[in-house]
């Protein structure tokens, strides 16, 4: 089956089965093009609760599909690339979190959405990179445990100096490998370019950026800016939407290392087969789901 026929088949199956395709901004262009909704983790979580589809095909990684299932237990949630995980999410498990919490009794736990359902269930509130600062500010406590991303924790600590942020030492391997020397090098080559960086990058990189934000915030900033050249410090998948929405502007990747291989696992064939056979369904234990739902709902209630 050629690509055109496969896309037609995906559309047919989608209609026949009342399915919706949600894709993260880091997915390959072909997946973004067939998706009904493309966005960051927060947008995908919100859209999952709004859709009346019976089947949600989540083109992303496991924790995203779990979040959709937690929020929409009556929907069948499929993860086409069933082995697409997140190394950062795997850097903490529920037992490690319990031990960490025991060191800091009565300190609330803010859990980055890039985490397992079990870790979410053991936390007090969830956050994404687009609402992390609001979430931390919303808490009454002057101390906050933040898991699992040390870099996002460092960025929050800088933005919310009135609170002590106690970080877990996890990180995104894709963003963490970007070096501040790469920023210096491109700054010299393109002094007129605006640097837009994700807060999962290290503090050394973040402090040299012109703007720091989630993928959706980066896309919005580029759209509204009068600048013509942008250097993008997040996973390369976001370039597709940036170039598509801003055809007269130029976008350059900050580092060639900004590629998440797990995000690149989903192919059209995966999506087609997942829909055709309704395979690779995500199941979350009901006890875990109910506890994790509270942390996600707490987040979604914050405006």
UniProtKB/Swiss-Prot annotation:
Keyword Cytoplasm among record annotations: yes
Sequence positions that bind iminosuccinate: 24, 41, 112-114, 129, 198-200, 215
Localisation: Cytoplasm
Enzyme class: transferase
Required co-factors: [4Fe-4S] cluster
Reaction(s) the record says it catalyses: iminosuccinate + dihydroxyacetone phosphate = quinolinate + phosphate + 2 H2O + H(+)
This protein's pathway: Cofactor biosynthesis; NAD(+) biosynthesis; quinolinate from iminoaspartate: step 1/1
GO BP of this protein: 'de novo' NAD biosynthetic process from L-aspartate
Positions of [4Fe-4S] cluster binding: 86, 172, 260
Record EC number: 2.5.1.72
Cofactor, how bound (note): Binds 1 [4Fe-4S] cluster per subunit.
Principal subcellular localization: cytoplasm
Superkingdom of origin organism: Bacteria
UniProt KW Iron keyword: yes
Function: Catalyzes the condensation of iminoaspartate with dihydroxyacetone phosphate to form quinolinate.
Family according to the record: Belongs to the quinolinate synthase family. Type 2 subfamily.
Protein name per Swiss-Prot or TrEMBL: Quinolinate synthase
Lineage: Bacteria, Bacillati, Bacillota, Clostridia, Peptostreptococcales
